[in-house]
């Protein structure tokens, strides 16, 4: 147990555990040098001593945490540690404790409780004994932070020996939503019936003097109720009853007093110890990561959750649930009130000289941002619901501001007309989103002396809310003539302020963000020199710190986009370029500069050499050495002479006054235009080409598509342009075109839904969303959906906006078409709504709007409507079904229990009851850890330079830093686990690779979602590593799960699934499941042909593998045919001398000879009336071992003439005998294969198109 725990609590345990299996001696050495050692902790109760593995760099509080988490020391929460009789400070590093070394003994000393410690102890004990139910809050939704990994591993363990996970798998079947739902679990053992606060709280004043802190009541499994006093000395049973108050100690036969509540309950309940052990055993079956609490990240909220009727979602009575807020934050809630701004800025001012300083500072920063993001998101939800009183109630709704929990909130709308010329509310909404991105970039730069407010943007119920920490002095009324802002534009661009104190810090910021120093002019025509955009403001806080605000214009406007004529005007003028593009353009220009510089030097050298050619031979040898050196210097170019910075205020209404200024401004504009052109002429075509050639992983859904575009510096507004480029590339990029169009529709729907939702009263939100979804996705089931609205509730909201009721499928489609035209300058095809992929679109929309839907079989198609009487699937059956729905209203109740009450109404694809919850979507400005990233980069470089030992040490150091700074559950840590597992796999340390890949899967599931594209990739990696470690059956289970997820998020035939199917086929061959293996190769071939064409090298490679699979499956006729096809493609594409062509030729000869010998053998057997074929094991068994990776370069080529039919007839005749002579079962199998596999694959191809 201690080890498993350490793995979570102490990052350094992980490497120790990972390398332990492979290099015991090395590890021992490394442990000592790396500062890992073991100490003994002396305890006041059983087991009286424990050993803990610690690191000299960690703090004493980390050791405390280890003790609290260990099963043998669960009961301790209120204690301190002593060494040599001296108390140790919790916040010092172990290396600073005098004389502490390996095998030292420290003592755990129980402390007296105070009220806060007592409350925390009760919360902790409730969690430990399984008495705490789910906390219901407005940030974490249903099943937040879910992981399915354990359930899938368990399924493998339960499966029979002979079966493998893919034995009856149908690649073309429709997706099953059960894939992403938590599996039903056996109820956990119950240790106590209840632990709650007693009605006698709070403690009267006279008893507080005597050390009373809380009164509790505990009901044991035996049904006895005990009233307990929480006292400074511990816990004891008192004489209270429900009617009489007497909190003095009660004398009972058992021991009625203990320092820990856990120990006391064990004394009072005879069954407690056994049930508590059973509970721990049950918990230990799960991977610790799946139950570990979130500390530095917000858990992912799944879009699909079990319905309220399921046991997984059942609501249980628990009186303490409503008392938990008091237990966690005290009577007046003051413990959770923090001065966020002061915390942010003092953390920034912490020292950063040594590595230890930086670790401490970054760790604190990460925790602070996580706490702030969570608190700000909770407050934003309350603001959106109208539960917080505004500071300016007389203003219009959009102009109102709020303060809650020391966080300042405002709406992302143009309440006061600041953005009137830029596009009003639309511009304001975009500006606050860009502001968070800008603040995140500045936080990442970490400039000394420049401060940013804590900032979060929350989208909830159609409203965008900005939460910021309160900058001291921001509300201060200035003297007449003084500006509210100290640097930059004041209330627009009419007045411009400058301040000498801001120049140096803004200069550093602008240099790093590639922003050019430039002049701007106020309304009087007065010139001001600014380091940044006129929109970027500097404020001198009353705390003396320099704050930067409004960072939404750190990059220039996309001039070309604004000038391009669309059929309708773009909604706003905030279409700026992305920071990633500016960075990419800077690198592009720098490489041009370096090349030019090298060329210039070479030509200069050539001239100098020509001049020197006549010099005497005596000096030649001396010169040779200096020449080599100068060549090296020549290749090293000093880039200090290169600079590229862009003016963000170009084309934004600035009016230069003099000719010189106008010339400079024209030059700035030219540079910005070149950047815009670089995006259009280089970045976008390159991305399309990379996807066409298969050089980069293919996006699977809207999220992964957006990430890919943003990484390349492409704005989402270019979806339409990319869709056009993709179409021009032809059918190979059909999958991309489908995704791009789906993303445009989803985003257009989101804008429309937000418009409707903004002023809908809270009880009608589900009705509004379900009605709009029915208009988009359910028009086939019900062409005239009617919104379900409770008329009695409606009358309570006379001012509510119910305009969504008027939406119809036709009006919604027209609105979507208009939004797509305006926002993406793309025209949807005429019947676009008939080719929607309903489930994938529903998932995308749910994620974009924060919906959590109750799982059921959603019906988007008339043919899916369940029939009440035997009816065909044709038109008559549907008509009859509809007729019955209309006439027999009451009779329908019994047939569909999921919607028993709703059957009276016309059938709908989505009903309001399907929308169980709506969660806020949070955009934050948390910076990444630069220290952890530096260590990882240094490790990578060392490995590239073949310094394996140093490289691995640095990488493990980076892992340790990641876990220390971010905590275990964080997307950045998941990413690192993923990268490290690949590194270990490449260095052939398979066990370590599997261990890290497993962690990557669980952390990705819990932070990014059980069906995110990253989760699929993590499962596919894990399956490869499990197979390499010899656990092929487990590997196949992971592949099956990944394929099931793929069907939900993308559908069938994703371009990257070719590789996965091939891997599955090779794994099945490894298990000698030749028949199944062949089916997976055939499926892979089907997808490959549809994407790359019949004559591509990709197709030939798969044909080559399929031929081998057919030979192993005793179908030599098929094998010869496929190998001939492969040979012909290689021959026409690569020529006769290529290695692939020659290999295919050799195989073809062997397989043809084989086919002949089998046919002869079959004839003999038939003559003797034997019913089996004895295949030649030597030629077919041992030689056919297709290696993964027998692939040629990907080239699409011309179609070769049909030379494949060369010898087909003779082979046909020969192989007629095999069919007659083979066992009946084989014949049936072949028929089944011919009938079943191919048509289904064709069908799936059609449906995906």
UniProtKB/Swiss-Prot annotation:
Biased composition range(s): Basic and acidic residues: 605-628
UniProt keyword Repeat present: yes
Domain annotation Clu: ranges: 318-562
Species name: Aspergillus niger (strain ATCC MYA-4892 / CBS 513.88 / FGSC A1513)
Function according to Swiss-Prot or TrEMBL: mRNA-binding protein involved in proper cytoplasmic distribution of mitochondria.
One Gene Ontology molecular-function label: mRNA binding
GO biological process: intracellular distribution of mitochondria; mitochondrion organization
Gene Ontology CC entries for this record: cytoplasm
Entry's localization field: Cytoplasm
PROSITE patterns assigned: CLU, TPR
Biased composition (Polar residues): 1176-1190
TPR repeats: 974-1007, 1016-1049, 1058-1091
Name this polypeptide is given: Clustered mitochondria protein homolog
Similarity remark: Belongs to the CLU family.
Subunit structure: May associate with the eukaryotic translation initiation factor 3 (eIF-3) complex.
Keyword tags: Cytoplasm, Repeat, TPR repeat
Region annotation (Disordered) ranges: 1-32, 605-636, 868-903, 1174-1249
InterPro entries: CLU-central, CLU_dom, CLU_N, CLU_prot, GSKIP_dom_sf, TPR-like_helical_dom_sf, TPR_rpt
Gene name of the record: clu1
Domain of life: Eukaryota
């Amino acid at each position: 147990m201690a080890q498993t725990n350490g793995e979570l609590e102490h990052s350094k345990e992980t490497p120790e555990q990972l390398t332990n299996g492979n290099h015991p001696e090395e590890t021992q050495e490394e442990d000592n040098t790396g500062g890992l050692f073991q100490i003994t902790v002396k305890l006041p109760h059983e087991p009286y001593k424990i050993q803990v593995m610690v690191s000299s760099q960690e703090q004493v509080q980390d050791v405390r945490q280890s003790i609290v988490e260990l099963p043998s020391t669960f009961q301790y929460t209120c204690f301190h540690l002593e060494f040599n009789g001296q108390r140790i400070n919790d916040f010092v590093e172990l290396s600073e404790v005098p004389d502490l070394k390996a095998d030292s003994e420290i003592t755990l000393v129980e402390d007296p409780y105070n009220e806060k410690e007592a409350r925390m102890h009760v919360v902790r004990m409730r969690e430990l004994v399984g008495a705490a139910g789910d906390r219901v809050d407005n940030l974490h939704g249903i099943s937040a932070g879910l992981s399915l990994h354990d359930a899938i591993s368990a399924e493998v363990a339960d499966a029979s020996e002979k079966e493998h996970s893919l034995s009856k798998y149908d690649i073309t079947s429709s997706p099953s939503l059960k894939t992403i739902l938590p599996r039903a679990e056996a109820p956990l053992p119950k240790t106590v019936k209840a632990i709650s606060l007693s009605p006698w709280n709070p403690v009267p004043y006279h008893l507080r003097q005597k050390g009373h802190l809380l009164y509790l009541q505990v009901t044991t499994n035996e049904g006895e109720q005990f009233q307990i006093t929480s006292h400074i000395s511990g816990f004891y049973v008192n004489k209270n009853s429900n009617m009489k108050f007497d909190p003095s100690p009660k004398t009972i036969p058992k021991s009625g007093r203990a320092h820990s509540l856990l120990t006391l309950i064990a004394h009072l309940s005879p069954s407690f110890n056994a049930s508590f052990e059973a509970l721990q055993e049950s918990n230990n079956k799960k991977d610790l990561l799946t139950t570990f609490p979130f500390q530095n990240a917000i858990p992912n909220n799944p879009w699909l959750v079990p319905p309220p009727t399921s046991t997984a979602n059942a609501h249980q009575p628990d009186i303490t649930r409503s008392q938990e807020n008091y237990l966690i934050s005290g009577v007046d809630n003051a413990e959770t009130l923090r001065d966020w701004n002061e915390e942010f800025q003092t953390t920034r001012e912490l020292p950063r000289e040594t590595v230890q300083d930086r670790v401490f500072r970054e760790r604190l920063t990460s925790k602070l941002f996580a706490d702030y993001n969570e608190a700000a998101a909770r407050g934003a939800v309350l603001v959106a619901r109208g539960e917080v009183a505004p500071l300016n109630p007389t203003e219009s709704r959009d102009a109102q501001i709020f303060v809650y929990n020391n966080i300042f909130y405002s709406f992302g709308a143009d309440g006061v007309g600041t953005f009137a010329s830029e596009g009003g509310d639309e511009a304001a909404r975009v500006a606050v989103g860009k502001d968070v991105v800008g603040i995140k970039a500045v936080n990442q730069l970490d400039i000394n002396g420049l401060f940013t407010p804590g900032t979060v943007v929350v989208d909830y119920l159609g409203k965008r809310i900005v939460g910021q920490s309160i900058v001291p002095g921001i509300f201060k009324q200035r003297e007449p003539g003084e500006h509210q802002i100290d640097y930059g534009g004041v209330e627009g661009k009419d007045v411009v302020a400058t301040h000498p104190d801001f120049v140096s810090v803004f200069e550093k910021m602008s240099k790093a963000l590639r922003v050019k120093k430039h002049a701007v002019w106020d309304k009087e025509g007065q010139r001001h020199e600014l380091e940044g955009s006129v929109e970027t403001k500097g404020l001198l806080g009353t705390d003396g710190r320099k704050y930067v605000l409004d960072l939404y214009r750190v990059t220039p406007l996309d001039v070309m986009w604004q000038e391009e004529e669309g059929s309708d005007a773009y909604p706003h003028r905030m279409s700026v370029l992305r920071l990633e593009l500016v960075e990419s353009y800077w690198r592009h220009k720098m490489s041009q500069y370096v090349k030019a510089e090298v060329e210039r030097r070479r030509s200069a050298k050539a001239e100098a050499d020509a001049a020197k050619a006549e010099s005497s031979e005596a000096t030649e040898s001396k010169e040779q050495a200096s020449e080599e050196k100068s060549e090296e210097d020549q290749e090293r170019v000093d880039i200090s002479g290169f600079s590229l910075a862009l003016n963000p205020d170009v084309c934004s209404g600035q009016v230069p006054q003099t000719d010189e200024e106008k010339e400079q401004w024209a030059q700035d504009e030219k540079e910005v235009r070149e950047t815009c052109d670089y995006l259009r002429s280089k970045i976008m075509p390159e991305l399309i080409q990379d996807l066409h050639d298969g050089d980069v992983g293919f996006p699977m859904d809207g999220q992964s598509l957006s990430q890919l575009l943003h990484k390349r510096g492409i704005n989402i507004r270019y979806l339409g342009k990319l869709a056009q480029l993709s179409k021009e590339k032809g059918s190979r990029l059909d999958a991309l075109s489908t995704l791009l169009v789906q993303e445009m529709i989803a985003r257009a729907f989101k804008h429309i839904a937000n418009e409707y939702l903004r002023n809908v009263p809270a009880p009608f939100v589900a009705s509004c969303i379900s009605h709009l979804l029915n208009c988009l996705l359910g028009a086939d089931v019900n062409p005239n959906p009617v919104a379900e609205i409770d008329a009695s509730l409606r009358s309570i909201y006379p001012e509510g906006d119910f305009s969504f009721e008027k939406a119809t499928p036709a009006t919604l489609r027209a609105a979507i078409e208009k939004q797509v035209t305006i926002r993406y300058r793309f025209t949807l095809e005429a019947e676009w709504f008939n080719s929607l992929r309903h489930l994938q679109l529903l998932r995308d929309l749910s994620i974009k709007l924060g919906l959590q839907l109750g799982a059921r079989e959603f019906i988007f198609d008339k043919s899916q409507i369940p029939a009440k009487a035997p009816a065909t699937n044709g038109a008559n059956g549907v008509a009859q079904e509809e007729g019955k729905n209309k006439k027999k209203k009451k009779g329908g109740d019994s047939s569909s229990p999921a919607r028993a009450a709703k059957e009276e109404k016309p059938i709908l694809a989505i009903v309001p009851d399907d929308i169980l919850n709506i969660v806020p979507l949070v955009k934050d400005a948390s910076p990444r850890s630069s220290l952890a990233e530096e260590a990882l980069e240094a490790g990578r470089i060392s490995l590239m330079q073949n310094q394996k030992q140093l490289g691995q040490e640095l990488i493990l150091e980076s892992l340790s830093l990641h876990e220390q700074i971010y905590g275990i559950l964080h997307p950045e840590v998941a990413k690192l686990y993923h990268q490290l597992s690949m590194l270990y796999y490449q260095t052939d340390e398979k066990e370590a690779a599997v261990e890290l890949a497993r962690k990557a899967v669980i952390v990705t599931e819990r932070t990014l979602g059980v069906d995110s594209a990253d989760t699929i990739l993590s499962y596919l990696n894990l399956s490869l590593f499990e197979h390499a470690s010899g656990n092929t059956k487990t590997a196949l289970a992971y592949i099956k799960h990944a394929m099931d997820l793929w069907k939900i998020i993308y559908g069938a035939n994703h371009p990257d699934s070719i590789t996965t199917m091939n891997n599955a086929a090779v794994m099945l061959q490894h298990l000698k499941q030749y028949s199944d293996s062949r089916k997976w190769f055939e499926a892979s071939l089907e997808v490959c042909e549809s994407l790359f064409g019949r004559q591509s090298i990709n197709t030939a490679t798969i044909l080559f593998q399929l031929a081998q699979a057919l030979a192993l499956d005793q179908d030599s006729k098929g094998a010869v045919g496929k190998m001939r096809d492969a040979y012909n493609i290689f021959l026409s594409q690569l020529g006769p001398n290529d290695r692939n062509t020659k290999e295919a030729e050799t195989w073809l000869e062997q397989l043809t000879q084989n086919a002949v010998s089998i046919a002869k053998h079959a004839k003999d057997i038939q003559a003797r009336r034997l019913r089996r074929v004895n295949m030649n094991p030597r030629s077919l068994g041992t030689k056919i071992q297709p290696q993964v990776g027998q692939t040629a370069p990907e080239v699409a080529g011309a179609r070769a003439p049909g030379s494949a039919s060369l010898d087909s007839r003779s082979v046909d005749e020969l192989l007629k005998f095999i069919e007659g002579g083979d066992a009946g079962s084989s014949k049936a199998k072949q028929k089944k294969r011919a009938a079943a596999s191919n048509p289904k694959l064709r069908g799936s191809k059609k449906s995906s198109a």
